């Protein structure tokens, strides 16, 4: 049975770093699987490795995810063998959330993001 997934983004207007600096308009990409119970007591939060993505289980295509840098490893979720119907983390029983880390390259604010307001962090134009 195909794993049903839903990829979304959560927006944070201002995110304060430990250094005191503020990041503005932070986007956090995440994917959910299953259904949250009425009591909200069946949620499981799974974090990926530093080089992973929020694409935990199921199948994905570049056409459905045009905003992220694509590679073949993204076509099948990195924990597809463990998350899904009748698997170790059964999505008919649990509501699973996997978010991409801040600074990641797969849809969350990171090195691929355009930060117009942070021009003081960019290099000046160099004429030949």
Q: What are the residue ranges of the model-derived segments?
A:
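Hydrophobic pocket-lining residues within nucleotide cofactor-binding pockets
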Residues: 15, 50, 123
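N-terminal cap/lid subdomain of alpha/beta-hydrolase-fold enzymes
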Residues: 31, 41-112
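A short alpha->loop->secondary-structure connector
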Residues: 115-118
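Residues that form or immediately flank small-molecule/cofactor binding pockets and catalytic motifs
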Residues: 14-15, 101, 128
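Single conserved hydrophobic/aromatic residue that forms the stacking wall/gate
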Residues: 120, 125-128
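Catalytic-loop region of hydrolases
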Residues: 1-43, 55, 59-60
């Amino acid at each position: 049975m195909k794993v049903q997934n839903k990829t979304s983004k959560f927006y944070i207007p201002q995110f304060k770093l430990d250094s005191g600096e503020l990041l503005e308009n932070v986007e956090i990409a995440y994917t959910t699987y299953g259904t949250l119970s009425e009591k909200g007591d069946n949620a499981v939060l799974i974090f990926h490795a530093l080089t992973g993505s929020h694409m935990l289980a199921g199948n994905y295509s570049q056409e459905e995810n045009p905003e992220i840098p694509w590679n073949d490893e993204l076509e099948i979720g990195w924990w597809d063998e463990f998350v899904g119907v009748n698997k170790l983390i059964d999505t008919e029983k649990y509501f699973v959330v996997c978010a991409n880390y801040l600074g990641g390259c797969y849809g969350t604010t990171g090195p691929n993001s355009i930060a117009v307001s942070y021009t003081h962090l960019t290099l000046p134009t160099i004429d030949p």
